[in-house]
């Protein structure tokens, strides 16, 4: 996962100055993970290789379809992942740097890009951890962040930031 975390760190570095690029990067990272999963597991790659179709193959193979999960609370959360993937793909299409904007531009703010990147990171982490569990991989324990480097969310936010 360190390589994936580095890619998301790079995406976060562009959030303020280039939010469109950050959204595109978040979508591209997810798409790469999903396509790698499909290839590594010798699954049939869908004809349309956008984010949604490749995620559909991955989630079915990992047993993440809502009907295959018994706990209703967990079903709700995992269904939320589907919405996140759909939203990130749509945001990339309508506001990302991957497509022209047409007549009407989308006013993408850094906070929107940050939401997309962080949400994509959550999806990526869950998918990779589920994949690891499926194959029986146990990653080495992570080195905890030293207390001097830890920052609470409230310390990062500007008091003027509207929610």
Tell me the role of every PLM-derived stretch:
Residues 1-86, 130-145, 159, 163:
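Amphipathic alpha-helical interface elements
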Residues 80-136:
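Charge-enriched, short contiguous segments at helix-coil
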Residues 111-112, 116-119, 147, 151, ...:
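Intrinsically disordered, charged low-complexity linkers and terminal tails
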């Amino acid at each position: 996962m360190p390589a994936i975390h580095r890619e998301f760190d790079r995406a976060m570095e562009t959030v303020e100055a280039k939010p469109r690029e950050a959204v595109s990067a978040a979508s591209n990272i997810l798409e790469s993970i999903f396509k790698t999963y499909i290839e590594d597991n010798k699954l049939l790659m869908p004809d349309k290789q956008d984010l949604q179709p490749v995620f559909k193959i991955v989630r079915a193979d990992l047993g993440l379809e809502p009907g295959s999960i018994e706990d209703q609370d967990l079903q709700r959360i995992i269904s939320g992942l589907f919405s996140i993937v759909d939203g990130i793909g749509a945001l990339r299409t309508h506001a990302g740097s991957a497509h022209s904007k047409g007549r009407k531009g989308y006013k993408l703010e850094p906070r929107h890009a940050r939401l997309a990147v962080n949400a994509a990171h959550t999806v990526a982490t869950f998918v990779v951890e589920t994949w690891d569990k499926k194959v029986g991989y146990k990653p080495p324990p992570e080195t905890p962040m030293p207390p001097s480097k830890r920052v609470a969310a409230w310390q990062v936010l500007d008091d003027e930031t509207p929610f």
